[in-house]
UniProtKB/Swiss-Prot annotation:
The keyword Transmembrane belongs to this UniProt entry's keyword annotation: yes
Organism: Mus musculus (Mouse)
InterPro entries documented for this protein: 5_LipOase_AP, MAPEG, MAPEG-like_dom_sf, Membr-assoc_MAPEG
Protein known as: Microsomal glutathione S-transferase 2
Organism lineage: Eukaryota, Metazoa, Chordata, Craniata, Vertebrata
Keywords: Endoplasmic reticulum, Leukotriene biosynthesis, Lipid metabolism, Lyase, Membrane, Microsome, Oxidoreductase, Transferase, Transmembrane, Transmembrane helix
Amino acid sequence: MAGDSSLLAAVSLLSACQQSYFAWRVGRARLKHKIAPPAVTGPLEFERIFRAQQNSLEFYPVFIVMLWMAGWYFNQVFAACLGLLYIYARHKYFWGYAEAAEKRITGFRLSLGILTLLPVLAVLGVASRFLNEYLDFHVAKKLRKPF
């Protein structure tokens, strides 16, 4: 595992702040529309903001685990850059959804693409580490010198 994982930690911290901000926006929408918890229905504006936050929250554990796995086992810089792009995609998704349901699509597709790529990188990294550690097969060396 990487000795210094400060890039992954910084992206994780930034993403946690984003999740907190989304929750705060739901709280503001509750006040604006006078919707007391545990109610989750109301005007369409509230429901879109609430749903955008809930969807982001549903994907968050997968994002965090895959970010760290890809960073530890594949490449920290690449994973952190993908993490920043994911945060941007979630921002675009949240604000698009808050405005109109149709405007969420671009951000959603981008974030889904990143959530598809991060696990692939994590699996490649873990497989490479496994082969190296337990079978003494060095993928990186084989790629440099195939024969």
